[in-house]
Amino acid sequence: MNYPKELAYPIQESSKAFPLEGFVPGQGPLDPQIMIVGEAPGRTEVENFIPFSGQAGKELIKSLALAGLTREDVYITSAVRSRPYHTKERINKRTGAHEIVHPNRTPTKKEVMLHAPLLDYEIEQIDPPIIVTVGNIGLQRLLGNKIVIKNYHGQLIQSPIQQSDSEGSGYHWTNKPYQIVPMYHPAAIFYNRTLAETIEKDWRGLTKFLMPSTTHDKPGSSARKQ
């Protein structure tokens, strides 16, 4: 998506004060069957500017197929548009030399807040029939910090969502309810193989929410605003 310069430029400039690199816009059709909201780009994504194009992206494509979807059917974005990293020193196991590396990390609440207007803009422009959050960061960006994936994964939630306020210092709730289906992050399977069956079941179950009657008026479980 092409963002208005007056929206994106200040965020990109402010991001320089944080350990963030690159900038990966959301990508996909403007009339998608679902919008996917992830956490943040990784190293691969900031190199090729394609969201979910690394190892987690391969798992996401497999999951989409379980719901009868392809990448071309969905709009993909994230709570933070730049790669969060931290700096650490380690010994190279092959050479024995000390080296400085910059692995991925989870974005902070301040970083999510900084990038919040971009996601607000995308949701406003696309008005997705269903928002699928993958992982806790995207879920909590929309529904508050007290809601966790383990309690809601695979369920249809109908609720207002958080939008950034005009000062960029906090959130307010939309008047309009949206339909959100939380899913485990595709990378979760790399760290906990026992989630494989649950992830498959949740994505197969997504198909029942993709019918035309679910665009914005189908009741789902509700999550209280936090």
Placement of each model-derived feature along the sequence:
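A polyanion-binding, active-site-adjacent surface
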Residues: M1-D217
